[in-house]
């Protein structure tokens, strides 16, 4: 089935009423996520890494959010199970062969179209876009993101379920498509033979987009960065395109033309490679998803999953622009 990359709740409701969800190659995926402190990565590595059966059996605040009310027929994908805490990243992606085990346990299949939605911040699209981008990086291209998320669904008066939806095990096969959709710290630091600049320093040739709110970028609001490690608020040469500004009041996305105009006004250059970042790779995924939807390209944006929280641990001097507070 051919569906747009961004879909409205009325279209989702039509699919539901026609009995298409979970029956005719379309799955709807609830991405409700309860933000929690970063788990101890060493402990998780020993006791939880890839143990999806036990992870899915444990109490889950995110699952509780899902069970409190969701779109009928929607299954839940938990970002804290789909990813794992590593030394440098809050949401590190598993190897493809491990991730597919989780996707199969949820009940997802290769040839299906996945519709992602969420609750809360950024019109419910913050964590939903992250999960959607994760699936893209594992080779699944048939995806849609629900504009306005669950709040929009409820505002329209559509049916809400509290049932735990369980599907038969799926046949989802994950591919390592990371090079197309995500970028690593090592790639950012790399230099090509004969070149003086690292990839991350080519800011005139590449759209390096910081998707945090302007106050964090400028240092007028708390950045979430460690002031003992970092003497700045942003990476030199990065442009600020806050994901929050993609939305109108009420939580829906701006029109496609408004988004295109906003991208240009904020320094986005057409046909340049694009890298998105934030603090932990979440807002960056929303910006990347929307750019990919309104400006489809053979070279889509790539998300820096580790973002500034990884950079402050591995190369803190890269975060050098903005207000300074440490002695030189």
From Swiss-Prot:
InterPro entries, A to Z: Rhodanese-like_dom, Rhodanese-like_dom_sf, TST/MPST-like
Keywords: Repeat, Transferase
CDD domains linked: TST_Repeat_1 (cd01448)
Catalytic machinery residues: 278 (cysteine persulfide intermediate)
Keyword flag Cell division: no
EC assignment: 2.8.1.1
Domain Rhodanese: from-to ranges: 22-162, 202-320
Phenotype when the gene is knocked out: Knockdown and RNAi cause reduced lifespan. Knockdown reduced brood size and halved the production of H(2)S.
Disulphide bridges, residue numbers: none
Any one cellular-component term (Gene Ontology): mitochondrion
Enzyme class: transferase
MF GO annotations: 3-mercaptopyruvate sulfurtransferase activity; thiosulfate-cyanide sulfurtransferase activity
Catalysis performed (reactions): thiosulfate + hydrogen cyanide = thiocyanate + sulfite + 2 H(+)
PROSITE patterns associated with the record: RHODANESE_3
Pfam family name, one: Rhodanese
Superkingdom of the organism of origin: Eukaryota
Domains (record comment): Contains two rhodanese domains with different primary structures but with near identical secondary structure conformations suggesting a common evolutionary origin. Only the C-terminal rhodanese domain contains the catalytic cysteine residue.
PANTHER family registered for this protein in UniProt: THIOSULFATE SULFERTANSFERASE, THIOSULFATE SULFURTRANSFERASE MPST-1-RELATED
Descriptive protein name: Putative thiosulfate sulfurtransferase mpst-1
Organism phylogeny: Eukaryota, Metazoa, Ecdysozoa, Nematoda, Chromadorea
């Amino acid at each position: 089935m051919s569906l747009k990359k961004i879909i409205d709740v009325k279209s989702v409701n039509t699919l539901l009423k026609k009995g298409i969800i979970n029956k005719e190659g379309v799955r709807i995926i609830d991405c409700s996520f309860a933000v929690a402190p970063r788990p101890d990565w060493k402990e998780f590595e020993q006791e939880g890494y890839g143990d999806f059966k036990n992870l899915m059996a444990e109490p889950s605040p995110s699952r509780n959010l899902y069970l409190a009310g969701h779109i009928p027929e929607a299954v839940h994908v938990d970002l804290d199970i789909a990813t794992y805490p590593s030394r440098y990243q809050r949401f590190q992606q598993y190897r493809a062969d491990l991730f597919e085990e989780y996707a199969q346990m949820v009940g997802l299949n290769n040839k299906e179209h996945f519709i992602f939605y969420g609750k809360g911040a950024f019109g419910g699209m913050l964590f939903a876009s992250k999960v959607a981008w994760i699936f893209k990086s594992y080779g699944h291209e048939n995806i849609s993101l629900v504009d306005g998320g669950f709040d929009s669904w409820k505002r329209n008066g559509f049916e809400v379920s509290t049932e735990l939806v369980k599907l038969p095990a799926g046949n989802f096969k994950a591919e390592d498509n990371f090079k197309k959709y995500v970028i690593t710290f090592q790639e950012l630091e790399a230099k090509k033979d004969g070149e003086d600049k690292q990839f991350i320093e080519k800011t005139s040739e590449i759209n390096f987009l910081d998707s945090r709110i302007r106050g964090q970028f400028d240092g007028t609001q708390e950045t979430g960065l460690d002031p003992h490690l970092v003497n700045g608020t942003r990476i030199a040469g990065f442009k600020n395109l806050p994901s929050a500004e993609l939305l109108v009041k009420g939580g829906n996305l701006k029109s496609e033309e408004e988004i295109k105009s906003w991208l240009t006004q904020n320094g986005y250059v057409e046909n340049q490679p694009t890298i998105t970042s934030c603090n932990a790779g979440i807002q960056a995924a929303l910006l990347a998803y929307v750019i990919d939807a309104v400006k489809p390209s053979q070279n889509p944006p790539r998300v820096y999953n580790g973002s500034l929280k990884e950079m402050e641990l591995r190369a803190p001097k890269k975060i050098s622009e903005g207000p300074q507070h440490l002695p030189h």
